[in-house]
């Protein structure tokens, strides 16, 4: 999933710059639905390869959701912009609470463990497609001829503040993934139930 997000973040950003945030978000939710569907089929057929391919597609959604706060910043008024970004971040915190509860409700709902969870993710992503279809975000205006271009990536990464920010974000994100991936597995490995593991992180 992380690899899928890494591979699609830059192309998705470029796509949004041309076609707008709404189109990019719809692609993200479609990627999430396809990824969850492939993952569900992988579980049903006991195919680890299909499960990994599904996770790769889910990375498209993971990449797209990182742009939500930028959409809020782009469309909100100057006075409301800080609150808009805060609401988006608060939604992320809420999902961190709701998500594990959905796992508890659906993990054993079918004969194959977690199959119901993945099918629920498919349904939620399709719901997201309809919600984003009604979202009104203006497309970005094309740059004027001869307009000054921003700094190149190499120029940005040579800026000490940006370099430090990238390093700190990379390390903290890697640690978060390590904790959030290994902890539930360790809980289940200690003979606790899945519903107990869902509340640990």
Task: Enumerate the language-model features and the residues they cover.
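Cytoplasmic helix-loop-helix junction between adjacent transmembrane helices
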Residues: 52-90
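Central cavity-lining transmembrane alpha-helices of secondary-active solute carriers
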Residues: 2-14
């Amino acid at each position: 999933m992380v690899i899928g997000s890494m591979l699609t973040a830059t192309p998705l950003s470029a796509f949004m710059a041309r076609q707008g945030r709404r189109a990019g978000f719809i692609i993200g939710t479609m990627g999430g639905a396809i990824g969850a569907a492939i993952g569900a089929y992988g579980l049903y057929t006991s195919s680890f390869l299909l499960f990994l391919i599904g996770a790769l597609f889910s990375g498209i959604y993971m990449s797209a959701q990182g742009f939500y706060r930028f959409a809020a910043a782009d469309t909100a008024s100057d006075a409301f912009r800080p609150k808009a970004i805060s609401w988006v971040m608060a939604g992320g915190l809420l999902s961190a609470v709701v998500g594990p509860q959905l796992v508890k409700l659906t993990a054993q709902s079918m004969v194959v463990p977690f199959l119901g969870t993945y099918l629920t993710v498919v349904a939620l992503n399709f719901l997201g497609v309809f919600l984003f279809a009604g979202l009104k975000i203006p497309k970005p205006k094309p740059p004027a001829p001869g307009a000054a271009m921003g700094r190149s990536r190499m120029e940005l990464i040579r800026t000490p503040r940006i370099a430090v920010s990238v390093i700190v974000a990379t390390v903290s994100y890697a640690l978060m993934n390590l904790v959030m991936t290994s902890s539930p597995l360790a809980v289940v490995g200690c003979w606790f139930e899945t519903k107990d593991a869902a509340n640990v992180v």
